Amino acid sequence: MDSKKRSSTEAEGSKERGLVHIWQAGSFPITPERLPGWGGKTVLQAALGVKHGVLLTEDGEVYSFGTLPWRSGPVEICPSSPILENALVGQYVVTVATGSFHSGAVTDNGVAYMWGENSAGQCAVANQQYVPEPNPVSIADSEASPLLAVRILQLACGEEHTLALSISREIWAWGTGCQLGLITTAFPVTKPQKVEHLAGRVVLQVACGAFHSLALVQCLPSQDLKPVPERCNQCSQLLITMTDKEDHVIISDSHCCPLGVTLTESQAENHASTALSPSTETLDRQEEVFENTLVANDQSVATELNAVSAQITSSDAMSSQQNVMGTTEISSARNIPSYPDTQAVNEYLRKLSDHSVREDSEHGEKPMPSQPLLEEAIPNLHSPPTTSTSALNSLVVSCASAVGVRVAATYEAGALSLKKVMNFYSTTPCETGAQAGSSAIGPEGLKDSREEQVKQESMQGKKSSSLVDIREEETEGGSRRLSLPGLLSQVSPRLLRKAARVKTRTVVLTPTYSGEADALLPSLRTEVWTWGKGKEGQLGHGDVLPRLQPLCVKCLDGKEVIHLEAGGYHSLALTAKSQVYSWGSNTFGQLGHSDFPTTVPRLAKISSENGVWSVAAGRDYSLFLVDTEDFQPGLYYSGRQDPTEGDNLPENHSGSKTPVLLSCSKLGYISRVTAGKDSYLALVDKNIMGYIASLHELATTERRFYSKLSDIKSQILRPLLSLENLGTTTTVQLLQEVASRFSKLCYLIGQHGASLSSFLHGVKEARSLVILKHSSLFLDSYTEYCTSITNFLVMGGFQLLAKPAIDFLNKNQELLQDLSEVNDENTQLMEILNTLFFLPIRRLHNYAKVLLKLATCFEVASPEYQKLQDSSSCYECLALHLGRKRKEAEYTLGFWKTFPGKMTDSLRKPERRLLCESSNRALSLQHAGRFSVNWFILFNDALVHAQFSTHHVFPLATLWAEPLSEEAGGVNGLKITTPEEQFTLISSTPQEKTKWLRAISQAVDQALRGMSDLPPYGSGSSVQRQEPPISRSAKYTFYKDPRLKDATYDGRWLSGKPHGRGVLKWPDGKMYSGMFRNGLEDGYGEYRIPNKAMNKEDHYVGHWKEGKMCGQGVYSYASGEVFEGCFQDNMRHGHGLLRSGKLTSSSPSMFIGQWVMDKKAGYGVFDDITRGEKYMGMWQDDVCQGNGVVVTQFGLYYEGNFHLNKMMGNGVLLSEDDTIYEGEFSDDWTLSGKGTLTMPNGDYIEGYFSGEWGSGIKITGTYFKPSLYESDKDRPKVFRKLRNLAVPADEKWKAVFDECWRQLGCEGPGQGEVWKAWDNIAVALTTSRRQHRDSPEILSRSQTQTLESLEFIPQHVGAFSVEKYDDIRKYLIKACDTPLHPLGRLVETLVAVYRMTYVGVGANRRLLQEAVKEIKSYLKRIFQLVRFLFPELPEEGSTIPLSAPLPTERKSFCTGKSDSRSESPEPGYVVTSSGLLLPVLLPRLYPPLFMLYALDNDREEDIYWECVLRLNKQPDIALLGFLGVQRKFWPATLSILGESKKVLPTTKDACFASAVECLQQISTTFTPSDKLKVIQQTFEEISQSVLASLHEDFLWSMDDLFPVFLYVVLRARIRNLGSEVHLIEDLMDPYLQHGEQGIMFTTLKACYYQIQREKLN
């Protein structure tokens, strides 16, 4: 043998696999022989036809042997050895199939190939007798768009037809005959068509007999929740019929549509064929007729009709003593649709008979083309209404339906003996028809059906509805049925139904759909659908009629069919329980049983005790592959037996009545059998190194195990569940949970058994075993089942079952002992039951053992060995783990039996297990009273402290245990910490202390992992930690703490206190979600407080400290108010913004400013949107108090004292027209006392004033009219005094700056350590970044990079230089761009308050100077902060020495001397707050500030602009002349786009164009320094233009320069030039005023004033 290699096949040596042995059917004694001429290739699959066969080898090649008349060469027609199909070489074939005379193959990419006989179109080729070589069949789905080629999974071939199963689980058919299932009369069909009737269903397998087809279809998912419709959607007949006679009731729910097909009227006319299949129960009731009637060939239709109706009337005459006149029960129960036209039917039948059965002469029957077809038609026609049948007969017939009719009340009649009625009662729905149809029912038949019925699933495949609620049939077994007394016949059916409903508990033991397992393993929830010719009953519908379309064989529902085989005229269905149902022709005993009739599925009786795991059906025989005791498959044959030589008696040319065991044990292990007409073939594997034997052992034991589990489920579990008084609801629920998990496990085992059977048919690679690849499926199912059964055990389930179940258990003691494998007769029933329930767990040991056996067949280094070895230990580990779980459960149960009863009820839980308790391990409470009793019980989820009649439960997830150090005086002490308690336990000895500590630690650890029920498989999860973590996640409800009473916390803990992220919820709806520290809210968090009165909630998001709101936050009130700002001790404290109401609400307003202890105090701005007023001033205790300014939307301006929210004391009031009042006020806008009123023209009144401004003022005083000659100094000084009563700029927004200093760790401005400040900045950035990571807003990449660069502190060593100044400037720009940085936050807040102050009503020209002062104040205060952070930065106005030499000297624009720095220092070299900070601050504040400038200069700007527009109407030459520009500076030529053009008198906007463009950029800059650079550049552009035209160096004098610059300013057309000029003037650095830029600015200013005075002549 080869050395063992990687794959399992190679490990064995491929020579010893897939050996082909062939037998001749019916010859005895049977001697198998090797296939003549076949070499040693491993065969995976074989298929046999009538005289030929096909082999598929492991490498995907196909060989044909036998008689091959379609081949071209004479040698190839009868080859001596199998010949290779060359057309398929290069294609990897995965499956093959043969019909009687044709073959098919499917490649791995889903293409089907056909070859052989094609007279009926069975090879999908038109007009060709033979297809000599494999030819690809084109199958395309015309419904799909675009057209898609259909990929094929499996083929099945009959005599004249072929079916293909596609990868999307649909059936495609071609060939000839009704067995195609297509609605057509045009045969042959050579283009594959979809069998529409099964479209949308999942078809698992197809099989073809000679002239019939079978399909295995997955059941639809249960529609339990949908209401059952009353009528059939297709034929509108009642789905449930009830006939209520005087003395009996018949209820039937076995409605079946004719052909199961939707019929429109037009279809009915066009295709009369569709009505050919009557509803099944009707046919079923007639089966005696068809079994016993043979109509002669030459009889006319009429004769047959009469004959059959005569049969119908007379067939039951044996028991009809009283004839009740009336309509036949059959037709009254359900109106069968009559044919549209009898003639059409006959025509159709004639057409069909042309394609009738091609009988083999060997079959011993003459061709009878018309007979079966006429038989089909008869039952469809209405019986004549006068037909007299007894009501009794109709009851018998309705009982006999093969689909299963429920009889609701017994029928009392002398004609029908009780025994017969009982026989009908005790048959299962599946067997009913079979037994009723046979003339006599033997005791064996009755016994057989009883057993079958007990095994049957209770709720599978049954419909329920309001009419049919008689569930005793399913839940209470056959025995209960015999107890219906005769007197019930007088009771109304409704009462009967009510009684039945009360008594029965419905238990569904069929597991629900389990997605994962069903996707990986074969489904057991299947239905069998059949169609085609049915003359021999091979369709299984209880009649001998053909079906043109698939129809479900109802009595196989719930039988878990996993494989179908079709012989010539019979069918076999193999179930997951290793049973075989057979139906159809039984001429030679090929069904494996002699029961009658053979038109419905009956169990084949194979004498072996073991189950069948594979079947094959030949033309007139069947093969059964069974499990044997030594796991080597045994082969049974049932069917035709040829007579021995010299024995010519015709009766010997029959068959075996019972299946015969063939002796083939010497061959090896048969993996697959295939049957043809005269021969059958087996594929055999040699058992090398025990590999094959181990695989067979695994498969056989799994199938047996499934049978045992099924028996336990049906014979023990179901009866137990249906018992009355099962105890408490909990017990019943637990038992139901056990039953449901048991069912799930049982179903999985059934699926696995089926998958192992198909695994043995294939390549048999160990690595593809489901138990290896998807071991978690099995491990989880066993674990779940063990959990449920141990829970049941702990709750005393078995003890509670004892009483109600004792009768049942006593009656079934032998069965119990047999199933549970308990041999000792003295064992108590409950113990046996206990053993029985724990039986499945043992299977894990078997898995481990078999996998280990398989592993030994591989080299130790191979991956297979490793995988098998690992899986084996996984299963073994789980088995031991579950064994421990069982012991724990028994130990816990023992404890509950001794525990005081009252406490048991509250403490006993299904999943709770006892670990240890202090009655046997001395443990006492420290400082306990002398007479107190303290009992400590450790469970897997809690530590219980019991005292007398009270107890306290401490959940383990929130319990911390630590040993006390000896210094603490606790020698054997354990300190226990829980969220609200702390106590010390003293143990008697150090050993006890260690034991308890270890037990508690392990229990806590297990509780935290949440893995107490999980097995220790997987990666290293079995490693126990020495002690549980101090920091952990857990959930806890407080019961003691007054603040937290009844609140539930879910989150992180540290040593008994919430610490880290968590959620705290109070019963009244309050909720906090965020960070905790030492048990208190601390850090960033969100808090919600419901406001029941307003049906809304208050909501806070922000920072907390020691359980209180502290730091920045946003509080949204239920009233709609929102506060954003600082908090301290749950109160608003510091800078904040309060928004009240929306613009549409009754009192919208906004306040931004300082708060102290929840009240407005200090400087603040209040915007009263309703009144259109804005107050900017001081506050105290929520009212305006002190100096302040009020502006209104009507242009009024007040500046002065406020007291208790009112203008009171001295003040100044200005109106829009510059009227001024300066004096005393007593209320808002109310003058009261001494004062001076000055008119816009300078006249003024001094005296006493009283009254409200704007509504008449009473004056007592003197009127002054200043003379024209009075100088300015004698005029009122009001305008000069105007800013005296406003709040000084440095007093504004102190809280904002204080907050920034506080963030840097300073008590006040400049009071702190620099290193500490930088540490605080780093912390602020990191925490903010962490919070941002959790928040939904994702930072952009550039923002992240900025943050990272800000975390580096700029280091400056050595003398301060321009480079270092530049570094600081860059750092500040980044910092101010990032709100997470304290400086960025400061700038953001200042921008917000500035805009809030000077936007809207605040955009008042009177406020301009205030606004400018405020900016200067910001600069001063921010510069102080910057100098604190960068101590090496020189103070304001200092000059930084230049480190690099000066660039090449540039001559001064004005003086012509070389530029000397001392005279005109450049900005950037002199350190000023505005130079450093304005570039950061001003762009953000520019819009409101510039608006104030524009308002203030409104009038003069209008005059300026009018002049600009007027002067700009002139052409260049005229304007230059008008402005007095010297002619030598006039450009003569201009270069436009590289071309030189002469300046003409009409030329406009062309001279000095570059200078004009340059000056226009002044409006796009923000800071004065940038604006000054623009002006300087403009001058240089003018200079360049003049130099170009003069071609000589010269010096500008102001007289020469001014007119030229004036021209440029005019042409630049800057709309708000005045505002620009004033802004520069107010904010430029003072040191620039006398330098070059200062002079240039003065020139611009002069131009502005000059333009206003220009008059154009």
UniProtKB/Swiss-Prot annotation:
The UniProt record lists the PH domain at 901-1007
Tell me which PROSITE patterns the record gives: DH_2 (PS50010), RCC1_2 (PS00626), RCC1_3 (PS50012), VPS9 (PS51205)
* Chain spans, region Disordered: 432-481
Biased composition, class Polar residues, residue ranges? 456-467
Q: What GO cellular component term, any one, is given?
A: vesicle
What start-end ranges are recorded for coiled-coil regions in this protein? none
> Which residues fall in a compositionally biased region of kind Basic and acidic residues?
445-455
Modification sites for N6-acetyllysine: 533
GO-annotated biological processes: behavioral fear response; endosomal transport; locomotory behavior; neuromuscular junction development; neuron projection morphogenesis; protein localization; receptor recycling; regulation of endosome size
Which GO MF term does the entry hold, naming one? Answer: guanyl-nucleotide exchange factor activity
Ranges where the VPS9 domain occurs: 1513-1657
Q: RCC1 repeat ranges?
A: 60-109, 110-168, 169-219, 526-577, 578-628
Q: Keywords on this record?
A: Acetylation, Guanine-nucleotide releasing factor, Phosphoprotein, Repeat
Q: Which residues form the DH domain?
A: 690-885
Query: What's the subunit arrangement here?
Result: Forms a heteromeric complex with ALS2CL. Interacts with ALS2CL.
Function summary:
May act as a GTPase regulator. Controls survival and growth of spinal motoneurons.
Q: Which PANTHER family match?
A: ALSIN (PTHR46089:SF3), ALSIN HOMOLOG (PTHR46089)
Put simply, this protein is called Alsin
Q: To which species is this protein native?
A: Pan troglodytes (Chimpanzee)
